[in-house]
């Protein structure tokens, strides 16, 4: 295959089959690939991920995808870890004994793709169980086109222990002990902390909105939170 309209980036760190099924269920064709040329030529790019930022960035670099992803100009949608990898960096907690000095209690900062100027940090759950796993509501929703037909109070499915704080790039928020960014965006890059592919009809609406998105909509003035 030399081209595809819609692609899912294969970083080796995601349940790609469930994302592919969620897209195809809506009647869209989609290709899973780590081919740089196919990704660059696609009209829409979906960037899912699960697990640790360190492992995912290692895979991205091993596949020579870092510069290609940073250079994309078409709409890109990240899910969960995919959203977190769009930020400047992720703080993944204490270094393990296999990473050097056992007495080093400093946090491990993982440089990410630096597509959206915010950072990911441990979720301030204020005593709530981590990971934050299950259905939760969006507490605020901007007018970003990815949220067409989505309202404050709508439920989405989350699984995460890290989150991006509220910033000028927040386009939706959620609360779990503290308020965090449920979605962020800058230019052509959009990230959702929740899993659209696991969020029933409303999650399907997010995916459909993205795949039907006219890139000119991203250039319109948005009212962020």
Swiss-Prot record:
GO terms for molecular function: glutaminase activity; imidazoleglycerol-phosphate synthase activity; lyase activity. IGPS catalyzes the conversion of PRFAR and glutamine to IGP, AICAR and glutamate. The HisH subunit catalyzes the hydrolysis of glutamine to glutamate and ammonia as part of the synthesis of IGP and AICAR. The resulting ammonia molecule is channeled to the active site of HisF. Pfam families: GATase. The keyword tRNA-binding does not apply. This is Imidazole glycerol phosphate synthase subunit HisH. Its EC number is 4.3.2.10, 3.5.1.2. It is found in: Cytoplasm. It comes from the Bacteria. One of its GO terms (cellular component) is cytoplasm. GO terms for biological process: L-histidine biosynthetic process. Heterodimer of HisH and HisF. The active site is at residues 80, 195, 197. Its main location: cytoplasm. The keyword Zinc-finger does not apply. It catalyses: 5-[(5-phospho-1-deoxy-D-ribulos-1-ylimino)methylamino]-1-(5-phospho-beta-D-ribosyl)imidazole-4-carboxamide + L-glutamine = D-erythro-1-(imidazol-4-yl)glycerol 3-phosphate + 5-amino-1-(5-phospho-beta-D-ribosyl)imidazole-4-carboxamide + L-glutamate + H(+); L-glutamine + H2O = L-glutamate + NH4(+).
């Amino acid at each position: 295959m030399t081209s595809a309209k819609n692609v899912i980036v294969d970083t080796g760190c995601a349940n790609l089959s469930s994302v592919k099924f969620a897209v195809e269920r809506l009647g869209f064709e989609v290709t899973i690939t780590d081919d740089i040329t196919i990704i660059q030529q696609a009209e829409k790019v979906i960037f899912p991920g699960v697990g640790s930022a360190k492992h995912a960035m290692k895979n991205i670099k091993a596949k020579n995808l870092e510069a290609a992803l940073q250079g994309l100009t078409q709409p890109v949608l990240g899910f969960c870890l995919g959203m977190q990898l769009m930020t400047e960096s992720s703080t993944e907690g204490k270094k393990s004994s296999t990473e050097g000095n056992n007495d080093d209690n400093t946090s491990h900062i993982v440089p990410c793709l630096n597509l959206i100027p915010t950072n990911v940090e441990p979720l301030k759950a204020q005593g709530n169980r981590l990971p934050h796993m299950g259905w939760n509501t969006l507490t605020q929703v901007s007018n970003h086109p990815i949220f067409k037909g989505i309202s404050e109070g709508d439920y989405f499915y989350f699984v995460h222990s890290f989150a991006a704080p509220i910033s000028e790039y927040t386009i939706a928020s959620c609360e779990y002990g503290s308020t965090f960014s449920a979605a962020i965006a800058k230019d052509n890059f959009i990230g959702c902390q929740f899993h659209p592919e696991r969020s029933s009809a409303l999650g399907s609406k997010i995916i459909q909105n993205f795949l039907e998105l006219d890139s000119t909509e991203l250039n319109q003035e948005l009212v962020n939170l």
